[in-house]
Amino acid sequence: MDGELTSGVAARPAVRKLGPGPLVLLAAALLISACGLVYELVAGALASYLVGDTLTRFSTVIGTYLFAMGIGAWLARFVRGDALSRFVEIEIAVGVVGGFSAMLLFAAFAAGVLFQPLLYVLVLAVGILIGIEIPLLMRLLRGDFEFDDLVSRVLSLDYLGALLASLIFPLWLVPQLGLVRTGLAFGLLNIVVAFATLWIFRARLRAPGLWLAAAVSFAALAAGFALAERFSRNAEERLYRGEVVFATQTPYQRVSLMQRGNTVRLYLNGRLQFSSKDEYRYHEALVHPAMSALAQPRRILVLGGGDGLAVREILRHPSVESVTVVDIDAQVTDLFRGQPRLAALNAGSLSDRRVTVVNADAWRWLEARPTSDAPFDAVFMDLPDPSNFGLGRLYSPPFYRLLARHLTADGFLVTQATSPVAAREAFWCIVTTMEAAGFGTAPYHAVVPSFGDWGFVIASRSPYRAPSRLPDGLAFLTPEVLRTLFIFSPDTARLAVEANHLDTQQLVTYYDQGWRRERN
């Protein structure tokens, strides 16, 4: 009976145990994909940090990379000679080009030399080389697997490598290593794959030249990794024209503190946040027009403002009982609370007993805060400019409406609103968006030499009236000066623009277009 049941069933082929050679090549498929994607994420992140326009940078970098991989896959048909030697040669080339790409791009931007052409040349080079490698791997493994099995194994490992890279890049690599060292670390990983291939196939590959090339490349990448922090500081000093006194990559941003003479400047992701020589103009203009218009402001919320400079101005008002600062980056608030010179700049505001610092995402914190808690008399949004979708969402009607639930009926919401000169459309887009959320608005602007003409908006549910009195000891604002801040010249006057909505993020487009126009 058993013979009758099994006679029509084809016998399954025996599972052959894989040797070290095929296992190394399969592992290479995973690592090649991970390395390639990391190189492109590094390039896209660095370009968005330095040039802005995050959506366009990442879209064009990833699109160019995938296109280049297609070119490489087509070119693989023309690769002649020993496929194993060619694979090792290409792996070394990928490690060197990809590993040093962030360093080259940073240096090019700091020197003002052909940054964007170099960006896409490097992306094309890495994509073409990796596009060649995958067909070569299949060629090398075709004797160990049936075709269907080979394709599924190689491609599944390739996609798995991409997944792993996309997860560890933002969660561990960039916060721990930074962009330059991340690129160099994965360059070293490519060279390790080359070494492993040379060793496992040493009986077949008698190529001392490849060993030498791999060793020299490994040494160069290791030296670059060891010197990466010094290189980054030197590049930043050249770019920002000052001495780096502190620089770190946090989970959220690149923080660079520069000093030139007696002036200290803070940069986040390459964008100036303040200069100690004139920050008082910005922070006085941000805080006092609203605070002085309130009879007895007691409870204040600051979103962003981890440098404590806006809090310093808020604490000039004796009626203030509590200030809550919600800033996502603990390393920034710790720096401005613990570093003596910076703490002196903000007058120790973050250590004041009335001040509570919360390191959290502003949107999530507000959603979690019970509406039964006492509302705030004023909210100050001292956030970075809306240069990407992550920041642009904090300038949207849903966020403004969320803030309104935590604001007193006669309270004020104040935001910095970029430059009405350089980014005129973006400035008036913020005004329009606040009005779309149900607020009345009072836009104004002030000249801050480090920034230029800078805009602000006061939003409220009752009419705003400029105060006739301000705190004593201000260096910039007087009641007479304050009244002039609400006057706009014809070249900064209101424009008809769209409101910023979460699905379209028109504000980010306006902002990028305005600042690109200003740079040109």
For every predicted segment, state its role.
Residues 2-330, 334-342, 347-449, 454-463, ...:
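Alpha-helical transmembrane segments of multi-pass membrane proteins
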Residues 463-520:
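SAM/dcSAM-binding transferase cores
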